[in-house]
Amino acid sequence: MAGTSPAMTGIIIMHDIKSIRDNPAAFDAALKRRGLEPMAESLLAIDEKRRAAILKSEQAQARRNSASKEIGDAKKAKDDARAAKLMAEVTELKTTMPELEAAVKAADEELAKELAAIPNLPLDDVPEGVDEHGNVQRHVFGEIRNYSFTPKLHDDLGVALGHMDFETAAKLSGARFVVLKKGLARLERAIGQFMLDLHTNEHGYTEVNPPLLVRDEVMFGTGQLPKFEDDQFWAVKGELLAAVDESAIGKLRSERLGLIPTAEVPLTNLVRESIVDEKELPMRLTALTPCFRAEAGAAGRDTRGMIRQHQFTKVELVSITTPGASKDEHERMLACAEEVLRQLDLHYRVMTLCAGDMGFSAQKTYDIEVWMPGQGEGGAFREISSCSVCGDFQARRMDARYRGPDGKPRFVHTLNGSGTAVGRAL
């Protein structure tokens, strides 16, 4: 069901096309760091076609306007022959202009579609690398605890205590779900509330209770669409699902809603298609929500336990700020997420992700990895939070801007981070 997002039908430029024109080599070099082939030449060819189509359309519009004025002048001068010739020209222009406008629209959509599939470009200080092996350790908190026994896996403990039930969850919903009961159900709720209270009371975040179902254009705004459509869960009205055939696919897509994979999606989109006053920035938002992921690319990975579930609970942090403040805001967000683990006295490390391991929308990412003694042979670090600065990448997709003292609208910068994943902390 892949297709063009509704948000892409206008000319929304996800990357600064002027920057690509000015320095195509730098754009291709940034893509290479992401493990991608050069694209500047093909993008600029589409851009040139688009600009030529716009020029033709504008010239035709201008000529129609001037010819219409000349008709009046010719009639005043009683030059009937010239007036007739000009009227014929205007009629022809009226016929050709829809074709020219259609060519502009087609070129707009072609460029937007190509740009929509290109990830954000890494900042200069992001480490080189193609996968997790290129990530760089930034710092460590705490130490590995020594046990007089062999630690068990969390799911073995949970099942033995009667507080985790994967078998019944599978009957209800299939694989990668769990039923939490008794003390673990209460503990999960308490941990989530602790995280939320910490971020709102001590870190200055505003609590939000957002919708869990969102439109395609909202998913597009934060970068889940179009590339990761298969990783999402979708809710569709029963009447549409019952009548699915090839002719109904378009309507199915236009009316479906996506279950949020993270509260980043609705929180960041709170500023979509708007211009906020610079005095309102930074906006710091947080939410405790269920999250839903199809995990289409995770077949065979972490099939046991609560590490990789289709449904999980997470506290999300989102910041909307100005370009000049986003670097410091990234460090602040990381510190807020770390404070959760410090207060829980959990051993963790912070990793700076390399260019090839970052998420689609990120310019730079810090992962917080918590030590899990029951994982692997003798324990292992596993991600519990990911804090990313996205620059204006998401803002361009959402058309989210701020107005400074000079009155000129500029794109905001967006940041997001887990504060943290409740199930993994549990």
Q: What are these language model-derived features?
A:
Residues H139-L426:
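TRNA-recognition modules of translation machinery and tRNA-sensing kinases, especially anticodon-binding
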Residues A2-T4:
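Extreme N-terminal basic, low-complexity initiation segments
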Residues G10-R145, H163, E167:
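N-terminal alpha-helical targeting/anchoring segments
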Residues P6-M8:
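A cross-taxon signal for low-complexity, glycine/charged-rich
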